[in-house]
């Protein structure tokens, strides 16, 4: 396949027969593309004298290109129990795609990567706080600080008093709203703008609390469609993980990496 004008990637995910690629080109501009990846496997060459490639065991091989990743999987399944039929190549499609684009080293430019620290605050009710899955308490404030600028973006329901700020290091962009729904709607409009979309989300306990709470609160107020826009591909994947002795649902915002301080 032809190479993308991709200097480096920040996320590659698979969705059916497509690879969802995000990164930056050689001019420092963000790239976000869906690629129909056609995998290549290698079979023992019919004429070894004309073979241009060899397997790691020295066997002369020739390429076989598939129309889709699912076709390649079906091919492997068909011949997996035939001992004399050996298939060479990498059936892990994302690493294979990465190597096709970057056969040598990858030169990352860290200053371009948009790393955003996320923190939410929820209102305490008379009965206390709910967990991230139930998300019963209203969100009363959201703050995002990204590495590519010096601005703290905060959405809140109460007035902001600059005189009690603990630091003057950052420019404060504070937006006050009458209702939680209005606040979340404005936050999502800001989040999905191409200039604001993160490459990486970080923060304290964001994987177990902030992200799942925000997703589940959005689902309560606006349905799953509202929550999906947190992903640049509108795809959110969930998985069950054991945390502190109990199972908990965590979410992947496809296209955005998560680096929780608690995991580092």
Regions found by a protein language model. Name each.
Residues 1-264:
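The two-metal-ion catalytic cores of nucleic-acid processing enzymes
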């Amino acid at each position: 396949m032809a190479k993308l004008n991709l200097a480096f990637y920040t996320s590659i995910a698979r969705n059916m027969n497509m690879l969802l690629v995000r990164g930056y080109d050689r001019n420092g501009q963000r790239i976000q593309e869906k690629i129909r990846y056609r995998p290549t496997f290698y079979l023992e060459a019919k004429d070894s004298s004309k073979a241009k490639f060899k397997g790691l065991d020295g066997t002369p091989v020739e390429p076989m290109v598939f129309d889709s990743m699912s076709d390649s999987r079906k091919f492997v399944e068909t011949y997996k129990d035939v001992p004399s039929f050996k298939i060479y190549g990498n059936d892990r499609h994302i690493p294979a795609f990465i190597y096709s684009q970057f056969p040598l080293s990858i030169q990352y430019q860290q200053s371009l990567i948009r790393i955003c620290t996320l923190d939410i605050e929820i209102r305490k009710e008379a009965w206390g706080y709910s967990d991230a899955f139930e998300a019963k308490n209203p969100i009363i404030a959201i703050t995002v600080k990204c590495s590519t600028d010096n601005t703290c973006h905060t959405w809140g329901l109460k007035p902001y008093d600059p005189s009690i700020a603990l630091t003057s290091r950052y420019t404060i962009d504070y937006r006050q709203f009458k209702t939680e729904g209005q606040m979340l709607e404005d936050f999502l409009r800001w989040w999905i703008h191409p200039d604001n979309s993160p490459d990486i989300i970080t923060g304290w306990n964001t994987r177990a609390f902030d992200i799942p709470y925000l997703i589940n609160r959005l689902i309560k107020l606006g349905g799953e469609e509202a929550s999906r826009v947190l992903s640049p591909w509108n795809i959110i994947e969930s998985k069950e993980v054991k945390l502190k002795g109990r199972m908990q649902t965590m979410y992947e915002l496809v296209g955005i990496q998560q680096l929780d301080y608690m995991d580092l």
